[in-house]
Amino acid sequence: MGKKQGKQLSDLKKELELDQHKIPLEELCRRLGTNTETGLTSSQAKSHLEKYGPNALTPPRTTPEWIKFCKQLFGGFQMLLWIGSILCFIAYTMEKYKNPDVLGDNLYLGLALLFVVIMTGCFAYYQDHNASKIMDSFKNLMPQFAFVIRDGKKIQLKAEEVTVGDLVEVKFGDRIPADIRITSCQSMKVDNSSLTGESEPQSRSTECTNDNPLETKNLAFFFTNTLEGTGRGIVINVGDDSVMGRIACLASSLDSGKTPIAREIEHFIHIITAMAVSLAAVFAVISFLYGYTWLEAAIFMIGIIVAKVPEGLLATVTVCLTLTAKRMAKKNCLVRNLEAVETLGSTSTICSDKTGTLTQNRMTVAHMWFDQKIVTADTTENQSGNQLYRGSKGFPELIRVASLCSRAEFKTEHAHLPVLKRDVNGDASEAAILKFAEMSTGSVMNIRSKQKKVSEIPFNSANKYQVSVHEREDKSGYFLVMKGAPERILERCSTILIDGTEIPLDNHMKECFNNAYMELGGMGERVLGFCDFELPSDQYPRGYVFDADEPNFPISGLRFVGLMSMIDPPRAAVPDAVSKCRSAGIKVIMVTGDHPITAKAIARQVGIISEGHETVDDIAARLNIPVSEVNPRSAQAAVIHGNDLKDMNSDQLDDILRHYREIVFARTSPQQKLIIVEGVQRQGEFVAVTGDGVNDSPALKKADIGVAMGIAGSDVSKQAADMILLDDNFASIVTGVEEGRLIFDNIKKSIAYTLTSKIPELSPFLMYILFDLPLAIGTVTILCIDLGTDVVPAISMAYEGPEADPRKPRDPVKEKLVNERLISMAYGQIGVMQAFGGFFTYFVIMGECGFLPNRLFGLRKWWESKAYNDLTDSYGQEWTWDARKQLEYTCHTAFFISIVIVQWTDLIICKTRRLSLFQQGMKNGTLNFALVFETCVAAFLSYTPGMDKGLRMYPLKIWWWFPPMPFSLLILVYDECRKFLMRRNPGGFLERETYY
């Protein structure tokens, strides 16, 4: 089954290979047994339906909800807590068997662990329950019905009953019900943006215009929309075999794997488990050697294992991630999967789509050429750029022609909105010109009303121009305006307007035109030419009837007024965001379905290709040599066409990804986007992918973190993604990266803080076993630390600010969430000082009450025996069992208070890993509150009446709070000295051994 699935997945990753668009229509009809006039017969349709299956997407195998819930309940860190809980119940049962009057400490601890694991499991399941439902979102794109010609009759069928060979009919507003070969059409345009990323409407025809099935004009694809006109076509693929079906199957079949934070927690579990089991085994053996029974040794072993488990850590990590997710949502990054919060911080490469992510997703007039000069239009989102061109003599004429020679109109319901935010009836280029003209003139409709249109030749693909005839403002006659492909417009002109004067269009002026046209086209911009002509009043008097079908007016010998070029301009914040990525060690790769020239131009504008860095094409153009003669290694950047990528093997792609830091992939298919992501992952990189179309969904799913667009993104891309950018802005990703890296550092600090207290919690049990010392702290008291006083301070680390500017992405092999240096600091250094502080307090109180240290060592058996009701202390005073227990529980409380006090300083030193506390400051208000909070909780547990019976916590004399304070101060001084020496000697011994 696994091999079959793997084979199917590899087939889906292959480029689409079709010949149905290239072969003659008659041959296609013979192959499919159909007819271009009458379609299939009913019997043929039934046979084809059985052969090819229904026109529907096959749902992937899904995991039952109860299994998902069990995975959350028993996976990873939860398993460690389950084991701890079970061991507590076993220890309690053993103690109960040995002594029926045993206290229920282990029972309470087991129940507490059970509660923690069930609650965190339920929370994780709730988060996961909202995750990927990719196939459902594909099904939402399915048309409900389709019009089909069968037996020569037009009938309406359910879309899933359409089969290969059917002759289908579509019109404006219809969704294409399957992959079809166009047999006839009239002014048909389709929206392929969700499939190819091409935002412009694509015209359809019966002619094969490209070998690539995604770019030819005689195919229309399942799920895409008909925007204009009507058409008929023969179905060539249905359901899973359609282009969109292949993408759906590919996206739903991919396994995105474990997130970096999940792998880190798994690594942490291995460390903690190994240490706990090893330590427990060692002390079990020591217990035997000291003469303890196997039952006592087993209880000791279980106690040590449980004492090593950080019970509150899972809840702490979950809450930290949740808080960061909420913070990111306020910055327009909506997280669908909690673990993705940290994954974005681990990102070392971003594969970004162009349209709408790096750019504004609106065509805008970028440049103009008039009066023999190229001027830059204001493309800023708030119109704050340079507008000096408005004073030029040729500008008003160019704007007049652009305003009049257009069918585009603003939608009336958006009249109250700013010009750039209004919707337009018309295609993207028309909308760009209309908005630019509106902002330049104040009111295009006013110009049109004063110079009314009387006739029009609409734009068509054969002529490549549009003409309209208008009344003069003074009603004295007519004039015409024309726009279209620049070369077509120029050939119809005999004069040109320069600085308000009409001069002959000679060879010099044509050369100036060609230079400007090439320069604008080389910037990846769509260029249109504009011209006009004053119709003589004696030949075209008022009331003249203009014929648009057989023009009875001149459409040559016109006056050229200028060029306008349009582009979807970069977002204002993107260049700075790309620069920040670079400084943070993140490689940004553009992966787009757009044309290479346009992609390269935008890449240069946003900084993906740095200023002065050349591609092989640039070098070839500069040296005036063929591209084949350029050494690829001499180029600093690469622009790879999808057709070239198709012919590459994995090694060639890997070589490009390794060698170039600046890469643009253009004209890529969905499968190629996926192959690029897999190639980057082979380099050991963590990959973030951005996208908005259905075509992006496989790459979004495969990436370490998929980032979909919230505004322009399709439902499919959002379901495949881990994160959604609510403002569709690439700059928001950088914010997410900064937050992700910060939370990784802060979770690391939180773990360091949490683990440190395990040593003072564990050491009393070791002293109990090794030196027969009466127990200095109880299990319930430990629980009050792990699930009480330590939780809020640990969570407060999520609010800690960064120590420095965005750092380089971490090396997942070398930089772990928990490493040996963190363990060494928490357990071997700070934890040991805390244990000394706790025992110092313990001995002070015991000594003050009569038991000096030399009396306490070896006293355990008599201390715990109810038979001794007259145990003497160092001064000869006799102690009953009840009095001894009251003193013991008072010491437990004091040890607990001592841990809280030394944890004050531990929390403060964990704020930074390198900087001094005095450099970082105490600006984290939540952490400051946490210090007060844990102190209040400790005081509440100690002094609240009834706690002596519930938790065996006893009120302390006020001066018993002071013995641990010197140790707390010692920890602060020690750590400040360590960090000072680390900063003085970067990379030295201290940094290598203690910097975690």
UniProtKB/Swiss-Prot annotation:
What membrane topology is annotated for this entry? Answer: Multi-pass membrane protein
Could you tell me which residues belong to the region Disordered? 191-211
Name a biological process GO annotation: sodium ion export across plasma membrane
Identify the species of origin: Artemia franciscana (Brine shrimp)
Q: Which SMART domains does the protein's record reference?
A: Cation_ATPase_N
- The molecule here is called Sodium/potassium-transporting ATPase subunit alpha-A
Instruction: Outline the subunit composition.
Output: The sodium/potassium-transporting ATPase is composed of a catalytic alpha subunit, an auxiliary non-catalytic beta subunit and an additional regulatory subunit.
Keyword line = ATP-binding, Cell membrane, Ion transport, Magnesium, Membrane, Metal-binding, Nucleotide-binding, Phosphoprotein, Potassium, Potassium transport, Sodium, Sodium transport, Sodium/potassium transport, Translocase, Transmembrane, Transmembrane helix, Transport
- Top enzyme category: translocase
* CC terms in the record's Gene Ontology section: plasma membrane
| Coiled coil feature spans | none
Protein EC? 7.2.2.13
Q: Does the keyword Transcription apply?
A: no
Q: Which residues form the active site?
A: D353
Q: Which residues bind ATP?
A: K483
**Which cystines does this chain contain?**
none
* Reactions that this protein is recorded to catalyse: K(+)(out) + Na(+)(in) + ATP + H2O = K(+)(in) + Na(+)(out) + ADP + phosphate + H(+)
The transmembrane segments are 73-93, 107-123, 268-290, 297-325, 762-785, 820-847, 889-909, 926-951
